[in-house]
Amino acid sequence: MTETETRSDGAAARTSLIGEEDEWIVREWIEREVGPVLSLEREGRWRPAWFVEVQGNDGPKRLFVRGARGGRWPARPLSYEAKVHRIFEEQGIKVPHLYGFIEEVPALVMDRVPGRPNISTAASEADRKKLLEQLADQMRLIHEIDPALIVEAGATMPVEPKAITFSAYRDAEGLYLDGDRRPSPDIEFVRKWLDRNVPPAIYDPCVIAMDAGQFIFKGDELTAMLDFELVCVGDRHADFSALRSRERVEGFDDPEGFYKLYEQRGGTPVDIDHVRFQHIAFSLYTPLQIANDLAHPRDQEDYHEYLIWHAISMKDALEGIAESMGVALAAYEMPAPARTQYLASVEALEVMAASLTLSDDFAAYRRDKIVLALQYLQKVELYRDAFAAEYISEVAELTGTRAASEEEASRQLEAFIAMAGPEHDEALLRVLHRQVKRQAMLLADEGTWLHQSLSTPLRPLNKD
């Protein structure tokens, strides 16, 4: 069964259970439009998606059905992504063949293309080099698509140079401003800094993927570009900034080298200062979109994952501002943990959740997420008093008023940011970065890739 709510763009957003009714709709659509369904399996993750095997005229074929996120984001509905996907396919971009769009679910039905993500897993440096060349070619082809086609699908066409720079960012900001949220001094500080420092675009607007660099490959062949829900018309430097975010875990360890490769393969020259600015805006994109969901959790949304996204993204945004300002941010030293009388209750719940009997991959996914959330709450219990005391004291030093709680401190800090001039930027940056690091350290165990991602400073971009 489903529910709907009104989104800021007037589209109906799915926000609740994806159940058997939806699977039957998917099955019936595929059997009507493609062929008899041999198997249909729900993917083990929060976003509704299915792996489907179909009997075709030339034998079995594999399909992938991708549902909507739910909630209030992204800014445009899944039907928009279907139109963009079709345009990309018609324009020669290497995408999975799209069979159609199931409006009732909603969902995209496409070929399941062989391949895997993460270029760091390429078998050799020679394979990696060929894959990067193909990615540069695909990005250039996307940037060369007539923007009018994407505007016709539902995007806006920015005209004024600063509007071009902010095109994609304003989409996410609109969701944030229209929604109900918790006090967010970190987001408010970055928003204000971006508005004060936005550079005018140096190129005409073009088609951009925004969440760029998502692809799968097999051997030395890029088999498909993926995920077009954020495609819009704007500044191409936004796409290059997205690759910087992929440096941490997806093998893009030389973004500057890729920018030169893009130019060598026919793309326009890349301006590093514009990439730096766009990376700050790109990093804020996700926190802007999920602020409402963090304040109001919904079923079928991965709350723990959203906390991780917020922490990583805000860390990158603040460290990007520090890079632009020439400010060196200090490492955060964790306080000593303090075990409370309530911790055993959370530990008991974790043991209980870990022992749950499972029926399928999706049930296993939900069980594992419950366990992760309970582990997070255990860390909250160990550090919350020390973290709160540190944060309240730091905010009081800035504002001159001592809050009674963390939430009150955040409200005071947000009000201070609204009135503060640029002379306070460095002090605010340090306080907010320390708070984001506290949030981040609650989400990851030492020795994990996540802990490394959250504790490793953003690598500066070099112009040479």
Regions found by a protein language model. Give the residues of each.
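Conserved NTP-binding catalytic cores of kinases and kinase-like/nucleotidyltransferase enzymes
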Residues: M1-P106, V198-C206, I216-T223, M325-A336, ...
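ATP-binding pocket architecture of kinase catalytic cores
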Residues: S39-A163, G174-D186
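C-terminal amphipathic alpha-helical interaction region
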Residues: L343-D368, L372, L377-D464
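An alpha-helical support segment within catalytic cores of ATP-dependent transferases
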Residues: L17-E33, V37, I145-G213, G219
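Short, solvent-exposed segments of well-ordered alpha helices
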Residues: V249, H274, Q278, A336-T340, ...
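Active-site activation/catalytic loop segments of kinase-like enzymes and analogous catalytic loops
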Residues: H237-V270, I280-D302, W309-S324
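Catalytic activation segment of kinase domains across protein kinase-like and atypical kinase folds
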Residues: Q214-F240
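ATP/Mg2+ or Mg2+-diphosphate-binding catalytic cores
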Residues: T2-T4, A13-R14, L175-Y176, L288-S345
